[in-house]
Amino acid sequence: MAVCARLCGVGQSGGCRRRRQRKGAGNDPELEDEEEEDEVRIEAEVLVEGQAAVAPLRPRSLLQLPPEILVEIFSSLPGTELPSLAQVCRKFRQILTTDTIWKRRCKQEYGVCENLRKLEVTGVSCHDVYVKLLHQYRHILGLWQPDIGPYGGLLNVVVDGLFIIGWMYLPPHDPHVDEGMRLKPVFRIHLMERNNATVECMYGHKGPHNGQIQIVKKDEFSTKCLQTDYHRMSGGRQEEFRTWLREDLGRTLEDIFHEHMQELILMKFIYICQYDKCLTYRRIYHPPNRPDDLLNPGFFKGTYGSHGLEIVMFSFHGTIAKATKITGDPNVPAGQQTLEVDLTRPVQLPDVEHLRNFDEISRLILDVQSQIQREQRQTGNEEDDGKGAGPDRAEHSQQPAPVHRPAKEDVNGVDNADDREQKPPNVQSFVLPAGVMARNEEYPRSCKMCFYGTGLIAGHGFSSPERTPGLFILFDEDRFGFIWLELKSFSLYSRMRDRFQHSEAPSLEAFDEMLQHMQSWTT
C-alpha cells in the first residue's frame, strides 16, 4: 500500500482501515482481492466554478488506467520496488508479469540492450535475467584487486550482454607502455534456460567449465574452480610455463638471457599456479576527480626495470600526489605507495645541454631534499621550544603550482582529442641525463612541469623499504615519468584509457580508507 499511496499521491484509504478491522476474521480470498482493488481506487475530483465536481472523462482509479499506461508507469520505477508493488492487488501482479517492464529495468540499471528474440530462443525472460542474474550478482560489479601475494592485479566485473564477465587487465608487453591493455576473461555468469545462474571458470585452454562464486563479506568475494583439470596441458608444467610466458609476458625462454630475470619470471609463474583453484578479490575504487588536480587521476601502466610493466593508481591528496601499485613484484608488492609527489616543490629544469649532465639533475633534486630536511629540523626545534610553526610561520607555500588544464575531460580521466591538440603554455624541453637507464627510449622530449618526489625501493620480500628522492616529470595529460636518483633509472607511465563503470568511491573517506587497507593486504 505504501508504494500505491506514493503513486496515487494520497494516504491510506478507508479500505486499509476496514482490512485492519476484519483482520483475523477468516475472509474469503476472492473477497480480499476485491477489497484490494477498492483500496487503490481514487476519487478524482476537480473544482469547477468554486464547487467540487467529478470529472466524468477521467479514470477514477489506477485500475481504470489502460494496461499500457500502467506498464509505462511501472517501467519507470526501480526494479527493487516492483516486488512491493506486486503485493498491492491482483491486477498489479498481472501487469508486472509483462516482460517489457523488466527489459527496461535491465537496460536502464545495468545497460543490457539484448534483443528479446535471443531470450525467447533460450526460454529466459527479462524478469529472470533481472532477478536471477543482474540483481543477484550486482554486488560484484566494478573493480577488484586479486589476492595473489605481491603481484596483485586488476579485475573489472561488467555486464556484457546476457553475461556477467570478470576481465583481468594485463599490461601490454614490456616495454611498450603506450599500447592498450590486454583483457583476459577469468570467469563468467549466465542463465541456462530458466534455472539459476551458472558460474563458469574461464582459465585454461579447454573452454568454460564449472566454477563457484561466494560473496565472503562486504567488498570481498572469492572464486573457486571445480574442474582444475581444464587448466592442465598435455605437455605438463613445462608446456604450461612456455604458454604463460608467451601469452602473459610476450617472451620465449630463448629471449631471457639475464639470470636474475629468469629467476623473477619463474618465481612469478610458480606463485600464480598456486591460485588457479581458489582466488579472493577485494574491491578498489577509481580515484576521485577534482577540478584543480594537476591532471586527471586514474590508472596508469609504468615501466619497472626487470619487473616489466606494472599498473599504478594515481590520486591526489591535497598538496601531495600518490601512485599506488595495483600490480607489484617481490621487492615492492601491490598495494604499496610507489611514488609520492610534493606539488608545492616545483623544479625548474636547466637547458638541454645541462640537463644531459646527471650531476646537474642530482644537484637540483638533492638541494630540494636538503631544504625539506632543514625545514623539518626547524619545525621540530620550534615545537620543542613551545613556539609551534603556526599559520604565519609556514616555511614554504602550501599551494600546488598552477597548471594548464583542458576545458573538458572524461569522467574516467580520458581527455578529449580536441583538447589534446591545444598547445599548453610554458613547455620545457626534456631529455634523460646521461647514464640514466630507461626501458623505453621513446619518451616525450618536452614536459609541462616537474616536481620533487620520492619513490619506494626495497629488497626482496619487501625488506628494508625506504623512500628515495627523485624527479616527477609531467609530460601531458596522459603521461608522466619519474627519475629514480639512487637507482639512476627512469620509469615512464602511460594512462589506461579503458572506461570503468560501478567504480566510483561512495566518499573521499571511503577512498582513503581503501588505500590504507591496500597496504595491509600485501604486508
UniProtKB/Swiss-Prot annotation:
Alphabetized UniProt keyword annotations: Cell cycle, Cytoplasm, DNA damage, Metal-binding, Ubl conjugation pathway, Zinc
Pathway: Protein modification; protein ubiquitination
Segments for region (Disordered): 372-427
Keyword Cell cycle: yes
Stretches assigned to the F-box domain: 59-105
Gene Ontology BP terms: anaphase-promoting complex-dependent catabolic process; cellular response to oxidative stress; DNA damage response; mitotic G1 DNA damage checkpoint signaling; proteasome-mediated ubiquitin-dependent protein catabolic process; protein ubiquitination; SCF-dependent proteasomal ubiquitin-dependent protein catabolic process
InterPro entries: F-box-like_dom_sf, F-box_dom, FBXO31/39
One GO MF term attached to the UniProt entry: ubiquitin-like ligase-substrate adaptor activity
Residues that, per the record, bind Zn(2+): C201, H209, C225, H231
Keyword Isomerase attributed: no
Superkingdom of origin organism: Eukaryota
Function: Substrate-recognition component of the SCF(FBXO31) protein ligase complex, which specifically mediates the ubiquitination of proteins amidated at their C-terminus in response to oxidative stress, leading to their degradation by the proteasome. Fbxo31 specifically recognizes and binds C-terminal peptides bearing an amide: C-terminal amidation in response to oxidative stress takes place following protein fragmentation.
Subunit structure: Part of a SCF (SKP1-cullin-F-box) protein ligase complex SCF(FBXO31).
Protein name according to UniProt: F-box only protein 31-B
Species this protein is from: Xenopus laevis
Gene of this entry: fbxo31-b
